[in-house]
């Protein structure tokens, strides 16, 4: 049985939090916060210096091989773009979905241009006009060049803005017929799928418009892995207590390729939540879960993966047994491990914000 999203506010007592850390007598959470801001300022200053070095170069000597350009590009464009573009299973599914789902002559908005791949696929599928938006200026310019090299600039327009900043009339000439929004991470929502679709559905898509994907589901299993736990938690090292590092541990879900780490599943796979992208509110919320343990053990997290409904019977998913997918699985940690016995039902609460999954007892 599938569970449709119940959108309601998340009570504070159900928010997942890392284990409390004892501050030393000469320490202060305010000093940690100030140090965090200082770290951000230093990173921004370093980027500004590299950008200034690029801008000071004569245009004729500016090269893509320049060290300053390479440094900025490394920080600015995540490496997963390459794995994604080389994911044949993903590409084939999306191309087929666009070919079957886009009516001839339709106006299409693609959220998140990247290299321009999906915008070009939409044009090839028969769209009359394609708009694609990209908030990263470097990627937007790459997409423009790739699209131009394929002779599609007369059909495709790249807009250097996030979708939430688009003006439906000024930028798009009116609401579009089809919305393409494959902006998902290992846990579905980490790239802002929910707020982006929520906004686009209300402001950028015609009332009877087509959404690709039209629905998204999360599946999951109870899981235990001391090795994965160590990726985001520490107590001692070399005989010293370094647990204060846990203040910078990831809160909520993070990516793990489960088949590369020793782990034990402690339940069968189960549907966790479904988002009807065309009709559901898509607001932050939570829902109860009841998962039955299949073995004795200590539950440390929920392992989660998504399933996108692309229409025409086409789905896109990243389960643990699919090594072909470039997407990893999501690891949603519990605050504390919970011992279970085989046959015991564990009651949990799954919560989601616009960007993060959390689970609590």
UniProtKB/Swiss-Prot annotation:
Residues 1-17 have a biased composition (Basic and acidic residues). It comes from Streptomyces achromogenes subsp. streptozoticus. This is Arginine N(omega)-methyltransferase. GO terms for molecular function: histone methyltransferase activity; protein-arginine N-methyltransferase activity. Its EC number is 2.1.1.381. The gene is sznE. PROSITE patterns: SAM_MT_PRMT. Keywords: Antibiotic biosynthesis, Methyltransferase, S-adenosyl-L-methionine, Transferase. Pfam families: PrmA, PRMT_C. It catalyses: L-arginine + S-adenosyl-L-methionine = N(omega)-methyl-L-arginine + S-adenosyl-L-homocysteine + H(+).
């Amino acid at each position: 049985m599938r569970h449709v999203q119940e959108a309601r506010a998340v009570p504070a007592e159900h928010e997942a939090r890392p284990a409390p850390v004892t501050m030393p007598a000469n320490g202060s959470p305010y000093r940690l916060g100030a140090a965090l801001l200082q770290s951000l300022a230093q990173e921004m200053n370093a980027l500004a210096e590299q950008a200034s070095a690029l801008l000071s170069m004569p245009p004729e000597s500016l090269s893509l091989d320049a060290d300053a350009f390479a440094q900025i590009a490394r920080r600015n464009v995540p490496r997963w773009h390459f794995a994604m573009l080389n994911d044949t299973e993903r590409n084939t599914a999306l191309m087929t979905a666009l070919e079957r789902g886009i009516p001839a002559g339709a106006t299409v908005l693609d959220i998140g241009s990247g290299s321009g791949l999906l915008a070009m696929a939409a044009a090839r599928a028969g769209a009359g006009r394609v708009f694609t938006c990209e908030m990263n200026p470097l990627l937007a310019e790459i997409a423009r060049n790739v699209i131009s090299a394929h002779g599609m600039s007369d059909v495709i327009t790249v807009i250097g803005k996030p979708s939430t900043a688009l003006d439906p009339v000024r930028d798009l000439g009116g609401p579009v017929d089809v919305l393409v929004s494959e902006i998902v991470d290992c846990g579905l929502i980490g790239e802002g799928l929910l707020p982006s679709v929520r906004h686009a559905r209300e402001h950028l898509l015609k009332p009877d418009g087509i959404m690709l994907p039209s629905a998204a589901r999360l599946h999951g299993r109870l899981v235990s892995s001391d090795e994965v736990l160590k990726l985001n938690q520490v107590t001692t090292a070399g005989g010293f207590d370094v647990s204060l590092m846990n203040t910078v541990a990831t809160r909520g879900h993070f990516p793990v390729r489960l088949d590369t780490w020793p782990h034990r599943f402690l339940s069968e796979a189960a549907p966790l939540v479904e988002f009807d992208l065309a009709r559901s509110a898509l607001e932050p919320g939570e829902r109860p879960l009841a998962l039955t343990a299949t073995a004795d053990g200590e539950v440390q997290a929920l392992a989660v993966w998504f399933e996108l409904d692309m229409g025409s019977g086409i789905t896109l998913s990243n389960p643990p047994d699919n090594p072909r997918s470039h997407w990893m699985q999501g690891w949603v940690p519990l605050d504390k491990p919970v011992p279970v016995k085989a046959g015991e039902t564990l009651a949990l609460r799954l919560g989601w914000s616009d960007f993060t999954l959390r689970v609590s007892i």
